[in-house]
């Protein structure tokens, strides 16, 4: 059945690739917090209820990792993603130029058709991290993809001299990687046009591995910025951006805001590439520190979720792994963290963002810092629940609105991102 239905779906998708679909719409809220944590076991197995809805956190039904409010596809869950395993085993050809693209697209279309309902309108994230689509971005352990590409070129073009073979390896890899990522997005958007499709960790920034020197600025690495400019085709093909703002375990807390700010500013920069209106930016936030497993502190939440809201991101995606729901004890730890720390802060930020939107932007845009470097300006309610002073914020209007306070209607589809 798969082999019969898949190509038929791809054929229909191919006929629609030039339809000129408008960007999908985002729920009408200035700042969204989404739950991408596999916590379904907490209630189903251990009877521990996590009150996400009451805390203003958007989750899938039953709190499943994949669902109709948001979904993420890992490397083995959509099509035939090529990569090398830990022992060097090639999966799906190992490198993009060895992959039969039509078979990949057929399978991806089949999987999307059967996993997401036609009206799906949430974030749909592709998590493909094994290689970078640009040759120069494959350093460290990723050099295996350069070596395999050179071996491929030597086999396919045996009569060329080594320098020409290297050129074929380089161009062949980049062209095939681009076709794979671009066409996967196009197929996905044609099948589920209201979904917010994009790749996790794109754009990169390269600001997380600097030394702990006192002169840390948080600015993105120059080479990474140049690669992001080269990836203009990826931003043009995406309908949302999902940068990672996971706090580095060794980075001093005093530098957290600079780290997050520059990652988001780079996402805002490329969000305009190939689009009349900037793409929504939804940053990935990890609930626990990678090495210690500790939940993010109140200050960590301010410097990740709070900074994202203050800079004008469309929202954040909260991510966690299966360990958070691996036992009744772990589920209660998660429950207590939600109720005591995370939930109250999410309520504060989302309500403040909504209040600022209505007070300053007529409800037709989101508030963002006038000066991104104004580190003390946040969208927070006062401790007594009263509204803050939004003088440090200006309006970023939704699609269909313009003016300093988003008071002027503009023709075109309305977008509330």
From Swiss-Prot:
Its main location: secreted. Pfam families: Glyco_hydro_56. Expressed in sperm. Highly expressed in epidermis of the skin, where it is expressed intracellularily in the deep horny layer (at protein level). Bone marrow, testis and kidney. Glycans are attached at residues 69, 215. The active site is at 129 (proton donor). Disulfide bonds join 42-331, 205-220, 356-367, 361-395, 397-406. Belongs to the glycosyl hydrolase 56 family. This is Hyaluronidase-3. It comes from Homo sapiens.
